[in-house]
């Protein structure tokens, strides 16, 4: 598999991105604590049908910030995605976003609907869609995640079977992503309010499609409920994928086939 690497300079950051495959463009937007490599295996499968674009969001791995203490804003990350798509293509693209990446994708839909053909927000972290005890539990989960994420990364790395030099490099990279996630992104994503009226307006007045999605193993968890509630708000189709919140890391082939089948079905509906 040939993977072409590139760098895009955007205001305040250099964005590292990767392109593989051929066919219609699909942009994959990772969640908190990850980077382009989170999608490595699923991107390789998708490259059988698509030109797959992955990237390290600003503040992650190879996408360096000009200001290391820059605050996190969904709108800034959305603008990065807009600029990256504009560099790659002048046509509407498929966009898949996971977790906080799904929120970034939805913000992109509001600001640049002309760039998005189909948006798949997979378990978006949108606590504004939750109420009562469900909301309280989600808030507590995010607080616990903020406290424990770094130690979980260290545990994960301790179980990794690779040489010590490679492990040291990867540990430094993932801990850097974890620091950005816990110190900036969690608060930023929780402070963000999605403009549902604006989203509904572009959803109903443009050819763009939004297909919220959740993992079949996540049904009892709040991100799944966020995706389900989003589908209810938009009165649109609801899609289920294999696995949990990060099912694409465990079920590469099944996940990519589900995504491809879904997009093929959508293409037939619009023909």
Swiss-Prot record:
Signal peptide: none annotated. Transmembrane segments: none annotated. Its EC number is 3.-.-.-. One of its GO terms (molecular function) is triacylglycerol lipase activity. The keyword Hydrolase applies. InterPro entries: AB_hydrolase, AB_hydrolase_1, AB_hydrolase_fold. GO terms for biological process: glycerolipid catabolic process. It holds the Pfam family Abhydrolase_1. Residues 24-124 form the AB hydrolase-1 domain. The keyword GTP-binding does not apply. Keywords: Hydrolase. Belongs to the AB hydrolase superfamily. This is Uncharacterized hydrolase YraK. The gene is yraK.
């Amino acid at each position: 598999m040939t993977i072409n690497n590139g760098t895009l300079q955007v205001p305040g950051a250099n964005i590292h991105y990767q392109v593989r495959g051929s066919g219609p463009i699909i942009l994959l937007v990772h969640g908190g604590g990850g980077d382009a490599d989170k999608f490595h295996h699923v991107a390789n499968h998708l490259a059988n049908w698509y030109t797959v674009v992955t990237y390290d969001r600003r503040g992650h791995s190879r996408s360096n910030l000009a200001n290391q203490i820059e605050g996190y804003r969904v709108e800034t990350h959305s603008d990065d995605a807009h600029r990256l798509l504009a560099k790659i293509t002048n046509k509407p693209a498929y966009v898949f976003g996971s977790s906080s990446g799904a929120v970034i994708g939805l913000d992109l839909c509001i600001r640049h609907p002309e760039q998005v053909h189909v948006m798949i927000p997979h378990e978006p972290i949108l606590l504004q869609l939750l109420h009562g005890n469900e909301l309280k539990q989600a808030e507590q989960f995010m607080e616990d995640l903020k406290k424990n994420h770094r130690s979980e990364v260290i545990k994960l790395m301790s179980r990794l079977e690779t040489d010590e030099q490679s492990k040291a490099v990867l540990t430094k990279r993932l801990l850097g992503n974890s620091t950005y996630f816990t110190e900036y992104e969690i608060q930023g994503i929780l402070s963000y309010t999605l403009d549902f009226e604006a989203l509904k307006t572009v959803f109903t007045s443009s050819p763009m499609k939004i297909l919220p999605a959740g993992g079949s193993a996540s049904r009892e968890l709040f991100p799944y409920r966020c995706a389900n509630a989003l589908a209810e708000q938009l009165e649109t189709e609801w899609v289920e994928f294999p696995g949990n919140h990060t099912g694409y890391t465990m079920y590469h082939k099944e996940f990519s086939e589900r995504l491809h089948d879904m997009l093929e079905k959508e293409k037939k509906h619009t023909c």
